């Protein structure tokens, strides 16, 4: 288990490390079947940041799906030491969330010590005029499904379902989707939020895709 000193150092590093993600070409897919409502692995926690309304919306949908929700205010210390570290020390389990960069930075690095990796990452940049740009990378089926679900103004709800249905495979893709924001969520527009799934790195074999 990382010490408290290591935890603080990771948090400080997260505040100064620059973050840059290239804008990817849209994933090419003719038609996308509706992905399963439940993932092949059970999410043990969905981490949501109460400071952001979009993240609050994710928490509401996660609770509706019966997933354990963890509410933070940017500080994951209590969650890590009291809940997640004891679980990961015995049985590394997948978690997901919509947070600022700092919590993801720390949890990703703690996951490395337990054989977990970020298997899905979304960067959500808020733009003027009520729009949001979603830059996504992860399993192909999840990325392909995002094209039909994240364009609407209820994207936090749809995002929660994508996170819950994210199955780890070697077959990956990246894309950028531009959507809209509900008026009551626009207070998040000065922030860039990150969605993510951290899961065991072992993946299902890649399968061939039809052209």
Regions found by a protein language model. Name each.
Residues 47-52, 72-74, 95-102:
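Structural motif
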Residues 1-2, 207-211:
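N-terminal secretory signal peptides
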Residues 76-81, 110-163:
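Ser/Thr/Gly-rich flexible loops in soluble cytosolic domains mediating phosphotransfer, phosphorylation
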Residues 27-35, 65-88:
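A short, well-structured beta->alpha microelement
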Residues 52-57, 79-80, 103-107:
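Short, charged/polar "capping" segments at the starts of alpha-helices
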Residues 1-15:
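N-terminal secretory signal peptides and thylakoid transit peptides that target proteins
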Residues 21-51, 57-63:
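C-terminal segment of N-terminal export signals and the immediately downstream linker at the start
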Residues 56-64, 106-114:
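Short, aromatic/basic amphipathic alpha-helical patches
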């Amino acid at each position: 288990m990382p010490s408290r000193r290591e935890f603080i150092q990771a948090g400080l590093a997260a505040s100064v490390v620059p973050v840059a993600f290239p804008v990817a070409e849209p994933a090419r897919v003719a038609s996308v079947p509706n992905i399963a409502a439940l993932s092949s692995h059970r999410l043990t926690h969905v981490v949501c940041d109460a400071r952001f309304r979009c993240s609050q919306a994710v928490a509401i949908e996660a609770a509706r799906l019966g997933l354990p929700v963890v509410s933070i205010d940017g500080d994951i210390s209590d969650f890590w030491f009291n809940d997640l570290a004891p679980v990961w020390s015995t049985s590394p389990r997948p978690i997901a969330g919509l947070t600022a960069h700092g919590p993801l930075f720390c949890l990703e690095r703690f996951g490395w010590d337990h054989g977990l990796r970020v298997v899905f990452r979304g960067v959500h940049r808020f733009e003027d005029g009520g729009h949001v740009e979603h830059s996504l990378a992860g399993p192909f089926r999840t990325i392909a499904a995002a094209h039909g679900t994240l364009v609407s103004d209820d994207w936090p709800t749809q995002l929660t379902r994508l996170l819950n249905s994210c199955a780890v495979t070697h077959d990956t893709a990246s894309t950028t989707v531009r959507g809209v924001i509900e008026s009551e969520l626009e207070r998040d527009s000065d922030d860039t939020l990150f969605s993510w799934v951290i899961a065991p790195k072992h993946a299902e074999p890649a399968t061939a895709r039809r052209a």
